[in-house]
Amino acid sequence: MAKCGVPQRVPGDCFRPVSTRHPRQIPSCFSICFLTHEAQSLRALAHSWWSGALLLLLLFLFLSLEQTSTSYNAKIKQKVGECPRQRLECRNESLSSCKTDFNCKAHFKCCQFACGRKCMDPYEEPCMLPSDKGNCQDILTRWYFDSQKHQCRAFLYSGCRGNANNFLTKTDCRNACMFVEKKGQCPLFPFQMRMECPASCKNDMDCPEKEKCCESRCGFICARVWLVKTGFCPRKPIVCSKIDKPKCLQDIDCPLDEKCCTRCGLKCLKPRH
């Protein structure tokens, strides 16, 4: 039988004594003893390794979240709604107040209008807005369209903020607002029993903000528009077991970008694009 040698004694305490015996072999034994300073070095090395690994893991998670956020924002570049079309031929761009929709408050969008990018309500006609001087200190002469008097008028602009009814020249104001066709669809009037009546409007700008100049049973009148949102309604089912009570009558009755669609009864649905 083999015998263990006499252990050599050195100053210090063992960090973790270990003894092992292998069965079915020639019996032998050994002990492992780390000196105190070696144990401390091992602890420091292990702590350093785990700290480095944790730091790398946190860095990886941060970069992953950053990439996910960037890709998400790239997919959702625009808010719901449609900007008014650019109505002027611009030789010089005016100062822009935004770059993307997400620079604008609430549901406002960053739109190219009147030769500059600005935050606008996609559901408002800019030429129907009142004059707004803004809240800075400059004194600049600008032009706005007075929808009540149906003419372009000068006003003093402070140099920032304000709204989209703001033009550099009277000509720009006239070109952008005098003969604008508002968004939306005129309501359908019956063609029977038409009468000859004097027109109460000549174009959309003769009407209040949410009305258009529409042909009716009695000449042209200002009528509340049917707002038609972008996209197409989903296909109707071939057979309906029952017809539900209408939840809407037109697109404007539906929230956000949903449309009023026929699907076993009128209801608000997500459109197809």
UniProtKB/Swiss-Prot annotation:
Predominant subcellular localization, coarse grouping: membrane
One GO cellular component term: extracellular region
Membrane topology: Single-pass membrane protein
Top-rank lineage group of the source organism: Eukaryota
TM annotation in the entry: 45-65
Presence of the UniProt keyword Repeat in the record: yes
Localization: Membrane
GO MF entries: serine-type endopeptidase inhibitor activity
All copies of domain BPTI/Kunitz inhibitor, residue ranges: 127-177
Disulphides: C83-C111, C90-C115, C98-C110, C104-C119, C127-C177, C136-C160, C152-C173, C186-C214, C197-C218, C201-C213, C207-C222, C233-C261, C240-C264, C248-C260, C254-C268
WAP domain: residues covered: 76-123, 179-226, 228-272
Alphabetic keyword roster: Disulfide bond, Membrane, Protease inhibitor, Repeat, Serine protease inhibitor, Transmembrane, Transmembrane helix
PANTHER family per the UniProt record, alphabetical: WAP FOUR-DISULFIDE CORE DOMAIN PROTEIN 8 (PTHR47769:SF1)
Name this protein carries in UniProt: WAP four-disulfide core domain protein 8
